A protein has these predicted regions:
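Multi-pass alpha-helical transmembrane bundle typical of ion/small-solute transporters
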Residues: 1-334
């Protein structure tokens, strides 16, 4: 591990990590509010406040299993140095900004994981990777959208059967109310999984500097600042991605929005409790596609879905390459 980092530099690195968390909220705000906005249950300006509140209080409902995975389960903790953390965050932040400006709903989570892998390999080679943890995370790239897809699909079919004798107006009226519940649950899942990723980064940075003693853990102040940064970013979330997620993939009514959010929330809850850092973007997109496919296959704009999938596939190698290049540049400069 590096020698003790000067305090101002340590604070600066923590600030960069919190900036990533803010960007995560900014970039992924659409995941929490896209369906409730596209179904016109809430206006965007009110929806972001709703999502930000539940993003902030998520730490009250979940443990810190995801933070532990990010801190010690992707890259060997003894490999982590301030330079590795900086390079990993740089790769993720650059990618987040580029995709946010382009309106592409890529994954902040996998951008960070790709950044960690790229920076870790640049420093210590492939031996730095904790293959079991990385394998579990990569598997989640595939399984989380598939789980969201099938849960949302089954929910739509079940709800349609239960309300088969109701008029469309009555169903809409009921689910406009229920969507407040489903949006709250999804925002809780988003806050519970996503904020923990930055918690893990800051905690392992502190651990690398000997500030946590011999045992890795996440201090309470780290939990609170990360949840606050994510919630603040959610308040400034971009309409570009809301539009892509909420209407370009498939049109949604309140019942379908409820099913998509509930299917996505259940997926996130399970992953968070298991300590798996999944992509909230992947999850809600899979759920929205599942809802559209339940109506009819042609209801899904597969061209849009395909472009999103391509962005996901590119995220890990792109952020790993940016992070590796950043590490080598800082190493040469040092």
């Amino acid at each position: 591990m590096d020698a003790a980092l000067a305090f101002p530099l340590l604070v600066s690195l923590i600030a960069v990590a919190l900036f990533f968390d803010f960007l995560n909220g900014l970039h992924d705000a659409a995941n929490s509010i896209a369906t409730i906005v596209s179904t016109r249950v809430l206006r965007p300006q009110y929806a972001v406040f709703w999502a930000a509140f539940f993003n902030f209080i998520a730490f009250l409902f979940f443990g810190l299993h995801v933070a532990n995975t990010l801190g010690t389960g992707i890259i060997d903790a003894d490999t982590i140095t301030p330079a590795v953390i900086f390079a990993a965050l740089a790769g993720a932040i650059v990618w987040n900004i580029v995709t946010w400006l382009a309106g592409i709903p890529s994954s902040s989570s996998h951008a960070l994981i790709g950044g960690l892998v790229g920076a870790g390999v640049a420093k210590a080679g492939f031996g730095a990777i904790v293959w079991s943890g990385l394998g579990k995370t990569v598997a989640a790239i595939v399984l989380s959208p598939l789980t969201g897809f099938f849960l949302a699909l089954l929910l739509v079919l079940a709800v349609s059967w239960v309300f088969v004798r109701q008029t469309p107006f009555a169903v809409d009226r009921s689910f406009r109310i229920l969507q407040f519940l489903s949006a709250s649950l999804y925002s809780l899942g988003h806050g519970g999984n996503d904020a923990q990723k930055t918690m893990g980064i800051i905690a392992v940075l502190l651990y690398s500097q000997g500030m946590l003693g011999d045992t890795f853990y996440v201090p309470l102040w780290v939990v609170l600042t990360c949840q606050s940064a994510l919630a603040l970013g959610t308040l400034f979330g971009g309409w570009r991605i809301v539009h892509t997620m909420g209407s370009k993939i498939t049109r949604l009514n309140p019942m379908q929005g409820f099913c998509a959010e509930t299917g996505g929330a259940l997926t996130l809850f399970g992953a968070t409790w298991l300590g798996i850092p999944v992509s909230t973007t992947h999850t809600i997109t899979g759920a929205i596609i599942g809802v559209g496919a339940a109506r009819r296959v042609s209801a899904v704009r597969w061209g849009v879905a395909k472009s999103i999938v391509v962005a996901w596939v590119v995220t890990l190698p792109a952020t790993a390459a940016i992070a590796a290049a950043t590490y080598w540049l800082t190493h040469l400069a040092g």
